[in-house]
Amino acid sequence: MYNINIQEITIIRNRKPAMKDVNQELQWFGGSLGLFNLRDRDKSCFRIFVEMVKSARERQALSSDELAARASLSRGTVIHHLQKLMKAGIIVHERNTYILRVDNMRSLIDEIEKDLDRTLSDLRDVAGQIDRELYN
């Protein structure tokens, strides 16, 4: 497990896919985390995300060049999406390679939940401090 600070994550509540197709479920999963949008017409971020999930299962970190080859994308496109995935706290950069933050999807959600809990706790503390200053 890696220690990271999530800078930005979006949670979107969507209907779960009716079919039990792993690609649809991965698309829904990543979409619910705000990773994919309409601008990603060729599903490049999704393709990179899938490769990162596969590499996590194999416990193998990948370079941007390896990801570009696996996903049939330019290195520039890969790096753009890797930065987005890092900013969301989904992947980490380690020794010129990238890897999913944890080795499975459930653990990823557990880690994001812990990050959100810490952030909400900080917000609650500051809100209490603001209330005391405003109302005393």
Residue spans for each PLM region:
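A short alpha-helical element within helix-turn-helix/winged-helix DNA-binding domains
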Residues: A61-A71
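A short, conserved structural fragment
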Residues: M86-T97
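N-terminal leader segment of winged-helix/HTH proteins
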Residues: M1-R39
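Amphipathic alpha-helical dimerization/coiled-coil segments
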Residues: S107-N136
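Short helix->loop/beta-hairpin flanking segments within DNA-binding domains
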Residues: D40-Q60
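Basic amphipathic alpha-helical segments that dock to polyanions
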Residues: L67, V78-A88
